[in-house]
Amino acid sequence: MITVYSKPLCHYCTMAKQWLEQNGFAYEEIRVDTNPEARQFLINEGHRTMPQLYHKGKLLVEGGGQALVRLDPKHVKELIGEVDVGDIQL
């Protein structure tokens, strides 16, 4: 599952979550305004902007929501290890 670190009233956060939903990706949203541990984690990782997208503790894509929506959903599936059988060519 993808973890989306977000904050309220963030256009890019909304855009990223909509893209994930439209392309069938499950995600967990963690709001940094109500979760000080998450906010500190992102600061320690060097992030100052939202959203930040992680999968299994690793940054999924540099550039947050803007970068995510430019990716092909198949590429994101490869990044998180969710390759459909129909996508595999023998």
Question: Which residues make up each language-model segment?
Answer:
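Short acidic active-site motifs
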Residues: 37-41
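Local sequence-structure signature of Cys/Sec-based thiol-disulfide redox active-site neighborhoods
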Residues: 1-25
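Non-catalytic, surface beta->alpha helical segment in thiol-disulfide oxidoreductase systems
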Residues: 55-89
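Structural micro-motif
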Residues: 45-54
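Short intrinsically disordered terminal tails
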Residues: 1, 89-90
